[in-house]
């Protein structure tokens, strides 16, 4: 995608602080802030089948605990972004993580599936602060190429969470049942809140007192919604995340119920799957000289290939767990190439409203991504096909978005 340059007003208002190289400490802290949200899905995934049995809920109701979380996660970003433009990144993210920790405690003691669905929604709202503010902090401190590199490093670090989360979650399930997974998240939330309080410096140089006024919000959102690079980036990330969320929602049922894999063994399988994400983000961080456009284009084709590899065997009546793992590894290599570069492309033109841009980007991306979870929950029929079709469809949309809309614009630029 071609990045539009800042407007004269944006250039005039741009903070003149130097964009210093990111240290390991900052990358680790940003990763931890985002990890709050990831852990809330990966830690409890192995417990989904037993959770339903314990609370007397069918698989469709159980999957709503994921959907409610994702939708609230999307809406929460719309709140935190403008607030952070007005009051600063630090107080906003601290408040959000504290809210997350309390909501997670409510999840751990939920007496029914309805109470758990509601608590998961509040948990998602709190977790939204970490991911929304982390993008704004990166935009505050770094220009386009450096931002993509930092986001790639964060992605490499975050690949540990979906890899180890299900393994830890599987052991927690064996040891203490589904409530143990949420108890672990309470501890994680409190620890990250303390770390953020100690280590995160304010990165917003010029707070905007009008950032939360309705007229300013509408004007800013209109500016973002009419920016073609921004919109295409949202569609790219939303589609590729839809494939991931569809997979995460369905895969415990596919492996544990269809293939009769034990929860602790299933969680180990995630190590191989998430290796693709690590590879993709590692390549993206090392090959920024290729340019974001080329990396995104390559990533969309790789993701489509992974989706095709997952869908074709079940259509032919040939289903094997190893093929599913290999296909998702390929898909996640493409994911790792697309995501950091698409985020950087979306945020680059808007230095003076980074919080609001991050908010709308995250909301739209997560709302689109939740469609993957909804699609799988609505169509699950006890086979691999709904999950595979969702992953393939996600890859196809990314190819259309980039090669059909972003690529022609870049050629004209």
Placement of each model-derived feature along the sequence:
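Conserved MFS/SLC helix-loop-helix module at the cytosolic interface between two early adjacent transmembrane helices
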Residues: 75-114
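Helix-to-loop junctions at the C-terminal end of transmembrane segments
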Residues: 77-87, 280-293
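Structural signature of the two symmetry-related core transmembrane helices
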Residues: 92-105, 295-310
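Helix-breaking motifs and short loop linkers at transmembrane-helix boundaries and internal kinks
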Residues: 54-56, 88, 109-115, 126, ...
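Helix-loop-helix hairpin linking two adjacent transmembrane segments in secondary transporters
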Residues: 115, 152-198
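Juxtamembrane intracellular "pre-TM" segments in multi-pass secondary transporters
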Residues: 13-19, 203-233
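Cytoplasmic helix-loop-helix junction between adjacent transmembrane helices
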Residues: 119-160
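Paired small-residue
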Residues: 99, 103-106, 114-122, 322-328
């Amino acid at each position: 995608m071609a990045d539009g340059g800042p407007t004269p007003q944006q250039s005039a208002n741009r903070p003149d602080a130097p964009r210093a190289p990111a240290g390991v400490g900052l990358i680790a802290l940003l990763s931890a802030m985002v990890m709050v949200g990831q852990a809330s899905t990966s830690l409890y995934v192995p417990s989904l089948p037993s959770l339903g049995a314990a609370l007397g809920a069918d698989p469709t109701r159980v999957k709503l605990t994921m959907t409610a979380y994702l939708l609230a996660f999307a809406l929460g970003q719309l709140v935190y972004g403008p607030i952070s433009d007005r009051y600063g990144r630090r107080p906003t993210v601290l408040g959000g993580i504290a809210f997350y920790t309390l909501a997670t405690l409510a999840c751990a003691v939920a007496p029914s599936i309805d109470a758990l669905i509601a608590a998961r929604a509040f948990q998602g709202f709190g977790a939204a602060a970490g991911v929304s503010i982390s993008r704004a902090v990166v935009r505050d401190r770094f220009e386009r190429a450096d931002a993509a590199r930092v986001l790639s490093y964060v992605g490499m670090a975050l690949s540990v969470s979906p890899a180890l989360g299900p393994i830890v979650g599987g052991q927690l399930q064996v040891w203490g049942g589904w409530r143990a997974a949420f108890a672990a998240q309470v501890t994680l939330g409190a620890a990250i809140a303390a770390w953020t309080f100690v280590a995160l410096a304010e990165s917003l140089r010029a707070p905007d007192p009008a950032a939360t006024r309705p007229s300013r919000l509408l004007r800013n959102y209109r500016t973002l919604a009419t920016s073609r690079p921004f919109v295409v980036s949202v569609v790219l990330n939303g589609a590729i995340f839809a494939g991931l969320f569809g997979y995460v929602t369905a895969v415990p049922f596919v492996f544990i119920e269809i293939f009769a894999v034990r929860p602790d063994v299933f969680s180990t399988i995630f190590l191989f799957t998430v290796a693709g994400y690590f590879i993709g983000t590692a390549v993206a961080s090392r090959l920024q000289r290729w340019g974001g456009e080329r990396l995104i284009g390559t990533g969309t084709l790789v993701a489509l290939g992974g989706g095709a590899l997952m869908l074709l065997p079940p259509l032919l009546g040939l289903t094997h767990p190893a093929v599913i793992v290999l296909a998702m590894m390929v898909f996640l290599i493409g994911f790792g190439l697309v995501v950091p570069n698409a985020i950087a492309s979306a945020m680059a033109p808007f230095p003076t409203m980074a919080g609001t841009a991050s908010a709308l980007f995250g909301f739209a991306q997560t709302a689109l991504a939740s469609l993957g979870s909804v699609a799988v929950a609505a169509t699950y029929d006890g086979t691999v096909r709904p999950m595979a079709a969702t992953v393939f469809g996600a890859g196809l949309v990314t190819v259309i978005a980039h090669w059909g809309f972003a690529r022609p614009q870049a050629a004209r630029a």
